[in-house]
Amino acid sequence: MSRSETLFANAQKHIPGGVNSPVRAFKSVGGTPLFFKHAEGAYVTDEDDKRYVDYVGSWGPMILGHSHPDVLDAVRNQLQHGLSYGAPTAMETEMADLVCSLVPSLEMVRMVSSGTEATMSAIRLARGFTGRDSIIKFEGCYHGHSDSLLVKAGSGALTQGVPSSAGVPAAFAKHTLTLPFNDIDAVEKMLAEVGQDVACIIVEPVAGNMNCVPPAPGFLEGLRSLCDKHGVVLIFDEVMTGFRVALGGAQAYYGVTPDLTTFGKIIGGGMPVGCFGGKRLIMERIAPLGPVYQAGTLSGNPLAMAAGLTTLRLISRPGFHAELTDYTTRLLDGLQQRADAAGIPFVTTQAGGMFGLYFSGADDIVTFEDVMASDAALFGRFFHLMLEGGVYLAPSAFEAGFTSIAHGEAELKLTLDAAERAFAKLK
């Protein structure tokens, strides 16, 4: 019995399902989840001392790779001064100034402790600003686990085969209108019917919780135009794409400006953190300036600010994102070539340093239906074969993968060699 198997059995005694986030349980791919004890650079090491090239990256934040020395030094330095104050710090202002300088649509920001808090707060703010109740989201897009957003959600909800969560009252969900991702005609029709009741449209500009589905040409631009027409607040959930697909996020990458944006993951450098921000006119509606209440004991935590500031400064160097994107492109090209050579139906998608892998005969992946039509069982087999080869992919056919600047030629070769062997065994 492996150490991970023993730990998983023990964990299930007092932790529901043995994990603290459902997708970690390997339900989608089968088998026992790996328990990790160390991470450095492009690698993670499990409790049985096996090392893997990591394409999960703690599900997105580790864009520099694990245990970057500058980030660790920043956290160690802050540790000498305390863990949390429950009061303002200079670093919070530094972070706000830096984030607003990197993302031009931001005029003001508020720090929180998670991506879920960020999206929940942004939606409350949009409702308070507009005086309207309804929101529009898209099938397969996951915006955290607040009640009103667990309607046809992505991420773990897809791997469990359920569209939403038990425990969410119908009254909470009735104001959540769900439309097909990448279908601008459906949005136009809905707003023509009920636009006067819609406070906001929230969207992952790249849907990263039903694997990785980039926006169709004109989709984000269409959302911007329709929101302007109907007085609806446009919210980009950039918890995943922020500072990853480009330094200015997906809004810079695709050239579309939202009214509000939510962030997480990279902005904390690996520490628990979230952030939302946008137009001053809207943000000034938040307490203590306005009537929309939002608060948090650990918001702006100094350890998270230290890690996040250091990370954002490091990724701001010229050429950083071009290098990250180039590695990701070469990785996907290599995987596609090896799948084609083995006669395996396989499609990849990419947005900067995030990617999707699909066992599908489709020409492209554009819709929720395209994602659901892919072969999740075959992905599960591929996942375990890649593990045997020393490569750790996301343990779900419905989660995006992530590269880091620590991934280099050695990791690329190891990954592609493992994939070549894996595809051969899938024939």
From Swiss-Prot:
One of the record's GO cellular component terms: cytoplasm
Pathway: Porphyrin-containing compound metabolism; protoporphyrin-IX biosynthesis; 5-aminolevulinate from L-glutamyl-tRNA(Glu): step 2/2
Keyword Chaperone: no
Enzyme's top EC category: isomerase
Entry EC no(s): 5.4.3.8
Pfam families per record: Aminotran_3
GO BP, sorted A to Z: protoporphyrinogen IX biosynthetic process
Keywords per UniProt: Cytoplasm, Isomerase, Porphyrin biosynthesis, Pyridoxal phosphate
PANTHER family reported for this sequence: GLUTAMATE-1-SEMIALDEHYDE 2,1-AMINOMUTASE, GLUTAMATE-1-SEMIALDEHYDE 2,1-AMINOMUTASE 1, CHLOROPLASTIC-RELATED
Quaternary structure and partners: Homodimer.
Family: Belongs to the class-III pyridoxal-phosphate-dependent aminotransferase family. HemL subfamily.
HAMAP family reported for this sequence: HemL_aminotrans_3 (MF_00375)
NCBIfam families, A to Z: hemL (TIGR00713), PRK00062.1 (NF000818)
Record protein name field: Glutamate-1-semialdehyde 2,1-aminomutase
Source organism of this protein record: Pseudomonas fluorescens (strain Pf0-1)
Lineage, opening ranks: Bacteria, Pseudomonadati, Pseudomonadota, Gammaproteobacteria, Pseudomonadales
